[in-house]
Amino acid sequence: ISEANAHPQSSEEAAVVAELRAGATPVGTTPFTTAVLNGDVDNHADLAAAEALELPVEVTTDAKVIPVLWSRRLAEGLAGEVAFRNAVAPMEGSVAIAGHSAAHPDELMLALRGSGQALYIGLADDAFVIASEPYGVVEETSRYVRMDGETPSDPANANATRGQIVRLDAAAAGQVEGINRWSYDGTELPLSETDVVTAEVTTRDIDRGDHPHFLLKELGDAPSSFAKTLRGKLLE
């Protein structure tokens, strides 16, 4: 656990980081992207080696490969969701990813694959609310779309089509029309109002303690949760 490994991770590779620290203006950089990850990119080391990624030595999180690969795909001329999908599709493991590109400031990209994580897209007034469970959505809206990381769009080609890619457009924030969805192989998965779920939980069901938001409660609980995880596994 370190500041260098904190999320979001950026697409800046080692040479760019060194120039920035020296006060210089980087030359010939790739498009700037950022990403956050919940889950594990099991083959991140293999991807870094295969693509000859120049990662800062102090950054050891598997999440770093996401924005770097995405930036490289954009630099190769791939556009929009195609670049994002090509970056995340080779990643093995169960992942929930959110990414942002400076070239498209009004868009947010999401990816979900596997059963270990979840992503909910809340439809609020003029806003999308992204959370890993309904508790993170219902404070702002009771309506949401749940991404599906397991069901293949083509059962005959399950491995390539399992998982979903989503692009959120700020121009239609909070509306179904602002959500574009594809399977991992690029097959479009149209949305309609029938995909929208009304939450069965409300803010009354959320135990926030004295915290104003559930996220702050989770952050506050982190030390005790960490201690409980280690309990019985370490010797004095």
Where are these regions (language model features)?
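Conserved short alpha-helical segments that host acidic/polar catalytic motifs at enzyme active sites
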Residues: 1-236
